[in-house]
Amino acid sequence: MAKQKIRIRLKAFDHSLLDQSALKIVETAKTTGAKVAGPVPLPTEKDIVTILRAPHKYKDAREQFEIRTHKRLIDIISPSPKTVDALMRLDLPAGVDIEIKL
């Protein structure tokens, strides 16, 4: 797997959980001898939803809710087969979405 790169994008609503997962991935890749670039923080997405508080009229009474999606990017440069094996066996929390590109 010479001259290849693995790009890992992580998404989560909880930034502390996301940082812990990114740290696990970086440590695992470094122990197998691969070069690691990151974790790079990507822009946070904010989804804002506005709803009416009252059931009938009173359009001025509104409430806003938001959910933030935090993202991180990790590049693993020149991974070995041991690196790929270790990443496949890695156990990460359920609240983290992982997208891997080779």
From Swiss-Prot:
Transmembrane segments: none
A Pfam family the protein falls into: Ribosomal_S10
InterPro entries for the chain: Ribosomal_uS10 (IPR001848), Ribosomal_uS10_CS (IPR018268), Ribosomal_uS10_dom (IPR027486), Ribosomal_uS10_dom_sf (IPR036838)
Domain of life where this protein originates: Bacteria
Gene Ontology biological-process annotations: translation
Keywords: Ribonucleoprotein, Ribosomal protein
Gene3D superfamilies, sorted: Ribosomal protein S10 domain (3.30.70.600)
PROSITE patterns given in the database record: RIBOSOMAL_S10 (PS00361)
GO molecular function annotations of the record: structural constituent of ribosome; tRNA binding
GO CC, alphabetical: ribonucleoprotein complex; ribosome
Family stated for the protein in its record: Belongs to the universal ribosomal protein uS10 family.
Family annotation (NCBIfam families): PRK00596.1, rpsJ_bact
Function, in words: Involved in the binding of tRNA to the ribosomes.
Subunit-structure text: Part of the 30S ribosomal subunit.
Name under which the protein is recorded: Small ribosomal subunit protein uS10
Organism field: Clostridium botulinum (strain ATCC 19397 / Type A)
